[in-house]
């Protein structure tokens, strides 16, 4: 009986041992399989700070990528690329045309100064400036020339020599003479020629166009509306009109791309440009001239300011649909 119990105990313990070994074996295999799987997955992955995608061309903060074909492209929200090379080329060509007009008008203006034709020079003064005002988004790239042509007296720094349109403006309207304008006139022609020659070297981008259009409206809000731009001649409405024309030209060039992305924005901008132009037309004298800015009432000035501000808000959205 004792031998039987001892054999049973041994067999029982052996059975328990086998069960334990089988369980441990299964657990070990599972653990080993999990470990192998983990290591395999880890081996197939690279650290997060080492991207696996091919290195792309440098991208600027504004989303613009240089391309291999030399054209400008903007990455849109839906991850497609918008080619703006045709638009930037068209805008640059238009500005080059404006520079031709600017030089021609400036030469006529200076010829009147040299001939002592005061009233004729005063009449041409605002018209001669308009091509420059339309083209400021590109003209301002050349920071040394812009102030030489367009600096206001209020913007002069200590010891700075004043030249350009506004220096001549002050003499014509405060001294009522052309005397003292000869050197200023010759310098103005030289500066305009230099600007005209430099325009073809300018790098024109979609961002410059969009930001330039908005800046033209901001300029109206900050200097034209207040009457600070043409403080002596009171010809601010000519500059006002030229700035609107410059911004509208950019909008027109970009319209096909905008139409494909946001047709409602095109409709809104078209209407709001028309509102501003209609308001300006109410202050027109004859076909090409405008009344002196100081003849506008406070309500008329306010109406212009509000129309420009309402135009500026959707105009700034052009960049959103192109990037």
What spans do the regions from the language model cover?
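Short, Lys/Arg-enriched N-terminal segments with co-localized hydrophobic residues
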Residues: 1-20
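Generic detector of bulky aromatic hydrophobic side chains
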Residues: 9, 51, 158-162
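Intrinsic disorder/low-complexity segments enriched in polar/small residues
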Residues: 10, 19, 23, 30, ...
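Gram-negative bacterial Sec-dependent N-terminal signal peptides
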Residues: 21-45
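Intrinsically disordered/low-complexity terminal segments and short unstructured peptides
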Residues: 22, 37-39, 51, 59, ...
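Bacterial lipoprotein signal-peptidase II cleavage site
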Residues: 44-53
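Post-signal peptide N-terminal segment of mature Sec-exported envelope proteins
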Residues: 52-74
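Mature extracytoplasmic or organellar-lumen-exposed domains after removal of signal/transit peptides
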Residues: 67-323
């Amino acid at each position: 009986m004792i031998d039987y119990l001892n054999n049973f105990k041994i067999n029982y313990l052996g059975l328990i041992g086998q069960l334990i070994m089988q369980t441990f074996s299964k657990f070990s295999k599972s653990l080993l399989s999990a470990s192998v799987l983990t290591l395999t997955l880890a081996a197939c992955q690279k650290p997060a700070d080492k991207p696996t995608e091919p290195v792309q061309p440098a991208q600027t903060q504004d989303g613009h990528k240089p391309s291999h074909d030399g054209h400008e492209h903007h990455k849109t929200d839906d991850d497609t690329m918008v080619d703006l090379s045709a638009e930037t080329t068209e805008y640059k060509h238009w500005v080059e045309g404006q520079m031709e007009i600017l030089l021609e008008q400036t030469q006529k203006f200076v010829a009147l100064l040299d001939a002592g034709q005061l009233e004729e020079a005063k009449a041409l003064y605002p018209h001669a400036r308009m091509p420059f005002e339309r083209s400021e988004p590109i003209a301002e790239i050349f920071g040394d020339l812009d102030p030489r042509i367009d600096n206001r007296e209020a913007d002069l720094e200590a010891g700075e020599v004043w030249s350009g349109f506004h220096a001549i403006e002050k003499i014509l309207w405060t001294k009522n003479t052309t005397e003292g304008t000869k050197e200023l006139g010759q310098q103005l022609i030289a500066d305009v020629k230099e600007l005209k020659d430099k325009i073809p070297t300018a790098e024109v981008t979609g961002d410059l166009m969009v930001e330039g259009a908005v800046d033209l409206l901001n300029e109206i809000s900050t200097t034209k509306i207040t009457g600070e731009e043409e403080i002596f001649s009171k010809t601010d409405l000519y500059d006002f009109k030229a700035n609107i024309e410059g911004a509208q030209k950019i909008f027109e060039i970009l319209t096909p791309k905008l139409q494909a992305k946001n047709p409602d924005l095109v409709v809104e901008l078209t209407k709001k440009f028309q509102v501003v132009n209609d308001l300006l037309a109410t202050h027109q004298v004859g076909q090409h001239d405008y009344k002196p800015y100081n003849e506008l009432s406070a309500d008329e000035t306010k109406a212009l300011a509000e129309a420009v501000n309402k135009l500026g808000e959707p105009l700034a959205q052009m960049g959103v649909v192109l990037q």
